[in-house]
Amino acid sequence: MGGGQTIDVPVEQLEAFPPDQAMRFLQLAHAEARDGFHYMFDSVRISDLVEQRQPLAVELAAAYGFLNSPAFLDFVRALTGDPRPNYVDAQATRYERGHYLTQHDDSAAEKGRLYAFVLNLTPHWRTDWGGLLNFIDADGHVAEAYAPAWNAINLFRVPQPHAVSCVAPFAGAPRLSITGWVRQIDLNLLPGRGPAPNPFRKTP
């Protein structure tokens, strides 16, 4: 979850909360979300784990490798007409019922963000389950909205106001995706220096 600061709470810890503590936790989160930027969803920070040479599921390592492959980066450059992209960071996300991401624009010039992406991995989704990727216009209206579609990627320039609507309490499945930013960075500043680190490298 996040607002003024990002707080990572292990899923096991959340599930172990007694009912009264869980209620207070949700009330605090919802108070933050009511008037500002806040989010609540499950995530695995793929890029951080790769760069720190931490253990990572083979499937997630493969996804990171694909996103940073010449084939994918060339695809992004061709699609956008932008020659700058040279690195993609990523996290795996799971939105359960009640999870959300309030309006923000992904502005972070110091991180070299050029485009945001959502690689949707939910096999079946109904629009009325929520979890829509909403783009917000200058009047605060939803100008466009996209439901998760299996194996589809949403790619858009940042900064740009957007949000993920709250997943409905009757949603029939979690909303699964890999998300992140296409960036232009000095690859020599990555841990270990040189090109994007090999996610399959074994930790000593």
Q: Which sequence ranges carry the predicted segments?
A:
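Fe(II)/2-oxoglutarate oxygenase catalytic core
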Residues: 1-154, 159-204
